[in-house]
From Swiss-Prot:
Protein family (similarity comment): Belongs to the universal ribosomal protein uL24 family.
GO molecular function ontology, one term from the record: structural constituent of ribosome
Superkingdom field: Eukaryota
Keyword Ribonucleoprotein appears in the UniProt entry: yes
Principal location class: mitochondrion
Record key words, sorted: Mitochondrion, Ribonucleoprotein, Ribosomal protein, Transit peptide
Classification of source organism: Eukaryota, Metazoa, Ecdysozoa, Nematoda, Chromadorea
Protein name (database record): Large ribosomal subunit protein uL24m
Domain KOW: 109-142
Residues spanning the membrane: none
Location relative to the cell: Mitochondrion
GO biological process, one term: translation
Length: 278
């Protein structure tokens, strides 16, 4: 009964779709430097004391991926300052909540979406979303909201001429600096999630016109494949889909120890003592 109910749960694209959804979470946390440096345990029942490289509450989110070279260097520098400030008992500038992560049910932006910029010199222009950042609730729009910056910092020290190019800057979704485009009239709109007709999946609809805003195919791209149906399984490393869907566990009204005893042919001849609950 529990399995059949789980199969009827509607699919939620706003939770599943992300470029790094197959990236190991432990690796992502290590690149953020938000893992414990040392854990002081065995405190006679008291909770463990954790000394972090950088406390998760003090992590500074960015529109870049945590594993990019520039971000890793920034995280390493911040963790070193964080640790040295703890050792010398000095003041450390902790993170202030400049922007909070939006709830999954409120997030409606994905790579490949057609959006309209609402602020800046490109106000009123439309473009496609290149990347999204859930931690900072920002998006990058292709060719819009740009500023002139160095292509490679410190290139003159290496004997390379300094080159400049237009770099896209993040636009905040929570501050409504960018909005989705309604496919009905190609005007900016807000969107919400609602169940489709069969009731098996949530879809995006415009709050103004009620038209569905389909999710672009680029939103399904991950670092492992471009489309899920085109993924090629690696023999010897990937578990075949048939083996994953095969049902091998049969629930029993028995404890783990009793199941092992049944498999090994061990018979219990002792009489259990009465148990009292307070």
């Amino acid at each position: 009964m529990l399995t059949s109910r789980a199969l009827r749960i509607p699919r939620k694209p706003f939770v599943d779709l992300d470029y790094a959804r197959h990236m190991p979470s432990a690796y992502v946390e290590r690149t953020k430097r938000t893992v414990p440096r040392k854990v002081f345990g065995d405190r006679f029942g008291a909770p463990d004391i954790k000394m972090y490289y950088v406390h998760p509450d003090d992590y500074v989110p960015s529109h870049r991926r945590p594993w990019e070279d520039k971000q890793i260097s920034s995280h390493l520098h911040r963790s070193d300052k964080y640790f040295s400030a703890q050792l010398s008992n000095q003041y450390f500038n902790l993170r202030r909540p400049k922007s909070e992560r939006m709830a999954d049910t409120e997030w409606t932006f994905f790579p490949g979406d057609l959006v309209q910029v609402m602020v800046g010199k490109d106000k009123g222009r439309q473009g496609l979303v290149l990347t999204t950042s859930r931690d900072s609730s920002d998006v990058i729009v292709d060719g819009l909201h740009t500023k002139l910056g160095e292509d490679m910092e410190g290139s003159e020290k290496l004997g390379v001429d300094k080159t400049l190019r237009w770099q896209e800057q993040p636009l905040s979704v929570s501050k409504k600096q960018v909005m989705l485009v309604d496919p009905n009239d190609e005007q900016p709109c807000e969107a919400r999630w609602q169940l489709n007709g069969p009731g098996d999946e949530y879809i995006r609809v415009s709050t103004r016109s009620g038209y569905e805003i389909p999710i672009p195919s680029q939103a399904k791209v991950t670092y492992e494949y471009l489309q899920p149906e085109n993924y090629i399984e690696v023999e010897g490393k990937d578990t075949p889909a048939d083996a994953v869907l095969e049902r091998t566990y049969m629930p029993k009204v028995a404890s783990f120890e009793q199941e092992i005893m049944e498999e090994m042919g061990i018979k219990e001849e002792r009489t259990p003592k009465p148990t009292f609950w307070y």
